[in-house]
Amino acid sequence: MDIPQADLDLLNEKDKNELRGFISNETQRQRVQGQTHALTDSCWKKCVTSPIKTNQLDKTEAVCMADCVERFLDVNLTIMAHVQKITRGGSK
C-alpha cells in the first residue's frame, strides 16, 4: 500500500499511528491468509490423491488432512519457541 508522502504529511501524529497500525494489521492478516492457503494446498496435494466422488473426504483423506495440519502447526510452534529462545539470548 503506497501512500504519497504529501498525503501522509497532512495527517497528525495520532492519525499516522492509527494508519501504521491498520497497515501492520492488514499485512499480518495477509501473511496468515497466505500461510493458510499454502497449508491447504500442500495438505490437499498430499492427502487427496483420488478423484472426488462425493462432497466429503473419505476417512483416510480426512485423517491425513487432520494429521497434516497438526504437523504443520506443531512445527510452526516449535520454530517460534526456538526463535523466541534465541532472541532472549539462549542458544539451546
Swiss-Prot record:
One of its GO terms (biological process) is protein transport. InterPro entries: Tim10-like (IPR004217), Tim10-like_dom_sf (IPR035427). It is found in: Mitochondrion inner membrane. Its main location: mitochondrion. It comes from the Eukaryota. One of its GO terms (cellular component) is mitochondrial inner membrane. Mitochondrial intermembrane chaperone that participates in the import and insertion of some multi-pass transmembrane proteins into the mitochondrial inner membrane. Also required for the transfer of beta-barrel precursors from the TOM complex to the sorting and assembly machinery (SAM complex) of the outer membrane. Acts as a chaperone-like protein that protects the hydrophobic precursors from aggregation and guide them through the mitochondrial intermembrane space. The twin CX3C motif contains 4 conserved Cys residues that form 2 disulfide bonds in the mitochondrial intermembrane space. However, during the transit of tim8 from cytoplasm into mitochondrion, the Cys residues probably coordinate zinc, thereby preventing folding and allowing its transfer across mitochondrial outer membrane. This is Mitochondrial import inner membrane translocase subunit tim8. It comes from Neurospora crassa (strain ATCC 24698 / 74-OR23-1A / CBS 708.71 / DSM 1257 / FGSC 987).
